[in-house]
From Swiss-Prot:
Family: Belongs to the prokaryotic/mitochondrial release factor family.
PROSITE patterns: RF_PROK_I
Subcellular location(s) per record: Cytoplasm
Tagged with keyword DNA repair: no
Protein's gene: prfA
Keywords: Cytoplasm, Methylation, Protein biosynthesis
Single GO MF annotation: translation release factor activity, codon specific
Assigned GO CC terms: cytoplasm
Chain segments carrying region Disordered: 280-306
Post-translational modification: Methylated by PrmC. Methylation increases the termination efficiency of RF1.
UniProt name for this protein: Peptide chain release factor 1
Coiled coil regions, renumbered to chain: none
Any Pfam family hit: PCRF
Length: 359
């Protein structure tokens, strides 16, 4: 196990005390909100640090007592009984703190942009993309998060060729960031008379929702085109010049949005563009920082097949951590917490292993 960073623990305690003092002094409302946010982030960590320090002090007292030859037999027996319990408590607290003190991803607390695109498999792939979107939508609903569709291109037989949505809430990106990659489905299409199993796929990308302070987009770096957009009356009825396409010239990234309001379209397209640029910057920094990263979970390679959904067997397999669950129906209803937590645990274990190697 990697050693606990004692200096970092002391610094966190010092900062927590400073925040408590500043909040008690009655600062301005905007300052108070920022302090309260940092306070709630630090509180669980500092609570564990204090519990750990208390347990270490208890252990030291017990060991001192046992070394004292003048202590009577009854007291020594009680101390010897307590010793294993205190050591076990310290070990458990050390493991918990190893996780709490891991380097934080600055984007973890952010909302996210979810992009799902049908891949190989034609109409079946589009239907599967629709199934995946509903799965994430239901998971988000259970978490109390808000889902808003930014743009959608429907498949001919249903589902989506492409759908982009924002999922708004605290910690959305932390929960969903390991969903990026190729999701494969194996099932018998409803139109298949012979009952043959077809394989199709959809690609999922989960991006942290970037704010203006996260990424700067210069006006001269973008080209905005206005296009005709279909209204409610059909393909060529009620068309308006509201659809917007924004091209980021330095990178070639293109984003479109086709809601009724041109103003809304521009804002939504800029929101997606900002998040894609922010994500590209994060990916570049990650690859430079961890070229030798051993964890498959955190690789972020969106061309990698990460999960298979086998409908005839009711089986879902996540290939990165060799996890197989026979609860496909429940997962498609949004019950993906078990997989999400297993992926996070695997990633944290790989981070801990790397920290141990560095020490």
């Amino acid at each position: 196990m990697a050693k606990l960073p004692v200096e970092k623990m002391r610094e966190l305690e010092r900062r927590f005390g400073e925040i408590e003092a500043r909040m008690s002094a009655g600062p301005a409302a905007d300052v108070y909100v920022k302090l309260a946010s940092e306070y709630s982030e630090l509180q669980p960590v500092v609570t564990k640090i204090r519990a750990y320090e208390k347990a270490v002090a208890e252990l030291a007292d017990l060991e001192t007592l046992l070394e004292d030859k003048s202590v009577d037999r009854e007291m020594r027996d009680l101390a010897e009984l307590e010793l294993p319990e205190v050591r076990a408590r310290i070990e458990a607290l050390e493991q918990e703190m190893q996780i709490l003190l891991l380097p934080k991803d600055a984007a973890d607390e952010k909302s996210a942009i979810l992009e799902i695109r049908a891949g190989t498999g034609g109409s079946e792939a589009a239907l599967f993309a629709g199934d995946l979107f509903r799965m994430y939508e239901r998971f988000a609903s259970e978490k109390g998060w808000k889902v808003e569709v930014l743009s959608a291109s429907e498949g001919e037989a249903g589902g989506y060729k492409e759908i982009i949505a924002t999922i708004t809430g605290r910690g959305v990106f932390a929960k969903l960031k390991f969903e990026s990659g190729v999701h494969r489905v194996q099932r018998v299409p409803e139109t298949e008379a012979g009952g043959r199993i077809h394989t199709s796929a959809a690609t999922v990308a989960v991006l942290p929702e970037a704010e203006e302070i996260d990424i700067e987009i210069r006006p001269e770096d973008i080209r905005i085109d206005t296009m005709r957009s279909s209204g409610a009356g059909g393909q060529h009825v009620n068309t308006t010049d509201s659809a917007v396409r924004i091209t980021h010239l330095p990178t070639g990234i293109v984003v479109t949005s086709s809601e009724k309001s041109q103003h809304q379209n521009r804002a939504k397209a800029m929101q997606v563009l900002r998040s894609r640029l922010y994500d590209a910057e994060r990916q570049r920094a990650d690859s430079e920082r961890s070229a030798d990263r051993k964890s498959q979970v955190g690789s972020g390679d969106r061309s990698e097949r990460i999960r298979t959904y086998n409908f005839p067997q009711g089986r879902v397999t996540d290939h990165r951590i060799n996890l197989t669950l026979y609860k496909l129906d429940r997962m498609m209803e949004g019950e993906i917490e078990e997989v999400v937590d297993a992926l996070m645990a695997d990633y944290q274990a790989s981070q801990l292993a790397q920290l141990g190697e560095q020490q």
